[in-house]
Amino acid sequence: MAQKKEEAAATPAAPTAARLQTLYHEKVVSALTERFKYDNVMNVPKLKKISINIGVGEAASEPKLLETALQELSQITGQKPQIRKSKKAISNFKLREGQAIGCRVTLRRKAMYEFFDRFVSIAVPRIRDFRGLPDTSFDGRGNYTVGVREQIIFPEIDIDKVPRIQGMDISFVTSATTDEEAFVLLTELGMPFKKKNN
């Protein structure tokens, strides 16, 4: 009997799906299929990745700002950020080619759904004077980007330890071919867009 308990404890538990991932498979797929009349389930749009980018233009004169941005982005996403470097020199901005100007994290699979859930459930409601996210930031190919002005909306960031308020861009990349499909997909997943006045 004790041996069976040890064997059961030794086998790792099956990974659990994120809440929104389960919601997508159980409800969103059928809602999108009904709305857009897809012939095949594989044609139903899905969230492919989320990219979070923080630009730190002053990193050349103040390298500590880039270190802070890296640390905060790591706390928010749970992944190590990549340092973004300038592709060309721009003398007006005192920018040299290859100079660090920001950082980025790309989330996929379970981490992506967990971040999306935290973003719409916890972070977005903490935005000051929030009345909904704009629905005008689609790129024409089914991807949506939103700018966040303050990193302190994320609960992982301690407001007392923040040296300065820093914004970021969050891009939601979908497999949708049109903005309408992407809008419905993100709405079904819980994205709080502005209500349209009739």
UniProtKB/Swiss-Prot annotation:
It comes from the Bacteria. GO terms for biological process: translation. One of its GO terms (cellular component) is ribonucleoprotein complex. One of its GO terms (molecular function) is structural constituent of ribosome. Belongs to the universal ribosomal protein uL5 family. This is one of the proteins that bind and probably mediate the attachment of the 5S RNA into the large ribosomal subunit, where it forms part of the central protuberance. In the 70S ribosome it contacts protein S13 of the 30S subunit (bridge B1b), connecting the 2 subunits; this bridge is implicated in subunit movement. Contacts the P site tRNA; the 5S rRNA and some of its associated proteins might help stabilize positioning of ribosome-bound tRNAs. Part of the 50S ribosomal subunit; part of the 5S rRNA/L5/L18/L25 subcomplex. Contacts the 5S rRNA and the P site tRNA. Forms a bridge to the 30S subunit in the 70S ribosome. This is Large ribosomal subunit protein uL5.
